[in-house]
């Protein structure tokens, strides 16, 4: 599964957060279903944006020492760029003021990538997202672009390429694309598609026959050309699934909030976690289908009442835990028959517990973690209504009490497992 894959040029923002939560939950669902999942972040570190990052850092580095160095027209102005430049200045001193320009740019580009990725990894871990593979685009340019050239050779041998106007083209229209695509431009540089094809071929070579990518909705046209390339190379249909994620609007009291009140910049993933909590952020991002634009209600996500669905779900779990640790209720002992559970709500709850495995299987197969969120809300709504009308502890009927304790234990386990699939904690008390 390849997801997030934000450019290493700044902090993760709320759009990345939706991608991160959704993709991580897909990984959890697939792992729960028995798949060996590679959690991959594709690092776009070979494009012009990295040169702009390096030049921007140099400009801020010079500024730190009271010197002038022009900030590129398309450079990066964010505070984190200033912070990284200041860190380099404090660590290295002023030696880069008079260094060879090429060596200096290479150094600042590498420092920028490494430090930005370290922050991205830190923030993803805060968000309970664990990346196990960081695949750099520059990897495919190593050893005189061996992997890219091998890929182009394979395509050429299959008759998939032709030259026109000094450029190398892929016959992608033969495989469902609306026009043929340039792989190598007339000036000799590669298009973004070329190393990306090599990247996907390399995934297959590493033993991952199923690939799931999560991309922003603005990459819609890119899906067809990538699938065309894999089909042309002989990989089975369905090898690559691309989930397109629509945009997020942060709203408060019905009004869109575009900037952080603290920094005046776009709201970052870290700020969101600090403001509403990881549990609420994860829940809200995975509870709405990614095929539609979502409004993230900051105030609703921050409340500690039943209007907040994640609070509603977590409170059900804490209620279950409270019953099970109540010293006035006899300790549960396992039974072979639970025939005393005849209350209508008890039968409905038992049915829902039984449906959990198939719900997980469906969510994993369709890559739809919101299916689990919907299941959780149905389960806890039924449980809260049961809790309000049925006494678990009946001193005059220890057999019924014990069977109801068994039901509560099964509900607790099911709810905890369901919440974990979404990366949401299941607190024992609230």
Tell me what each language-model feature is.
Residues 1-430:
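Non-catalytic interaction-recognition regions
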């Amino acid at each position: 599964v390849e997801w997030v894959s934000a450019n290493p040029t700044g902090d993760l923002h709320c759009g990345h957060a939706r991608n991160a939560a959704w993709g991580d939950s897909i990984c959890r669902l697939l792992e729960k279903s028995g798949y060996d999942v590679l959690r991959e972040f594709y690092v776009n570190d070979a494009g012009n944006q990295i040169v702009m990052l390096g030049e921007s850092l140099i400009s801020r580095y010079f500024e730190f020492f009271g010197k002038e160095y022009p900030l590129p027209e398309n450079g990066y102005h964010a505070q984190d760029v200033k912070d990284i430049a200041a860190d380099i200045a404090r660590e290295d001193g002023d030696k880069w003021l008079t260094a060879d320009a090429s060596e200096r740019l290479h150094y600042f580009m590498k420092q920028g990538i490494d430090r930005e990725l370290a922050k991205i990894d830190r923030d993803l871990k805060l968000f309970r997202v664990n990346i196990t593979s960081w695949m750099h685009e520059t990897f495919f340019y190593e050893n005189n672009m061996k992997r890219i050239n091998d890929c182009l050779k394979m395509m050429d041998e299959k008759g998939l390429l032709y030259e026109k106007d000094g450029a190398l083209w892929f016959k992608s229209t033969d495989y469902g694309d609306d026009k043929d695509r340039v792989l190598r431009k007339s000036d000799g540089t590669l298009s973004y598609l070329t190393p990306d094809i090599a990247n996907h071929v390399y995934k297959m070579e590493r033993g991952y026959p199923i690939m799931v990518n999560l991309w922003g909705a603005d990459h819609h046209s890119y899906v067809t050309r990538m699938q065309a390339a894999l089909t042309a190379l002989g990989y089975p249909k369905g090898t690559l699934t691309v989930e397109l994620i629509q945009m997020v609007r942060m709203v408060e009291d019905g009004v869109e909030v575009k900037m952080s009140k603290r920094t005046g910049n776009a709201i970052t993933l870290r700020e969101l976690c600090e403001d509403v909590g990881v549990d609420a952020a994860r829940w809200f991002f995975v509870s709405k289908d990614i095929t539609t634009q979502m409004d993230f209600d900051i105030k609703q996500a921050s409340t500690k009442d039943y209007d907040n669905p994640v609070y509603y779900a977590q409170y059900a779990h804490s209620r279950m835990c409270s019953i099970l640790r109540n010293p006035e209720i006899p300790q549960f002992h396992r039974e072979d028959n639970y025939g005393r559970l005849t209350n209508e709500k008890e039968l409905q709850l038992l049915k829902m517990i039984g449906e959990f495995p198939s719900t997980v299987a469906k969510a994993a197969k369709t890559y739809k973690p919101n299916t689990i969120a919907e299941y959780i809300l149905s389960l806890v709504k039924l449980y809260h209504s049961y809790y309000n009308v049925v006494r678990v502890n009946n001193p005059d009927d220890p057999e019924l009490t014990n069977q109801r304790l068994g039901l509560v234990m099964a509900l607790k386990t099911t709810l905890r497992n369901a919440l974990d699939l979404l990366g949401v904690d299941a607190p024992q008390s609230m």
